[in-house]
Amino acid sequence: RSFKELEKILKEEGESISRLYTPNVYHITRVIDIDELPEDNFKSADYDGILLSTTGDKSDAIITRDLSKTLTVMPGDCLVIALIDEKAGIKGILHAGWKGLIDGVIVNTINMFKEKGANVKNIRGLLFPSVSMNCYDLGEDVISRFRDFAKELGLNEKDVISYNKEREKYNIDLR
């Protein structure tokens, strides 16, 4: 049912829905240019006439110069970011869980855009809904890494990290 709803939405936006491309998500920072992959690298499945093609290689982001290709991610509760530089003719989509976010999946994706001729000033992004405070509990090991990451970005820790005294666990906001 959800693929049919997606098909309707994308058709309204003028997107092709005969095939969807998605990264083989593993909470890593690897970015793949799907234009450089041979067809046999994709693992594909047909869902009511819509072909879902997942990269055979592990990655959390994919890019393409073929703006007619429809990119998607199956995120769970992680952050999804769609990027496009229309002037350079490059678009991409990435999956950013807390680990990929901290380890640099966004930076790696933007760097690949630049390698392909994009200008950072022309890249536009769209953030999709994701996990927010109180969605799940995290321990001190994760929070210490996330705290360092937030500090590096100049974020106010209180805006992205909370502590639940009752459960004695931390929560983060990826939005």
Model region roles, listed by residue range:
Residues R1-R175:
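Active-site microenvironment for binding and transforming phosphate-containing groups
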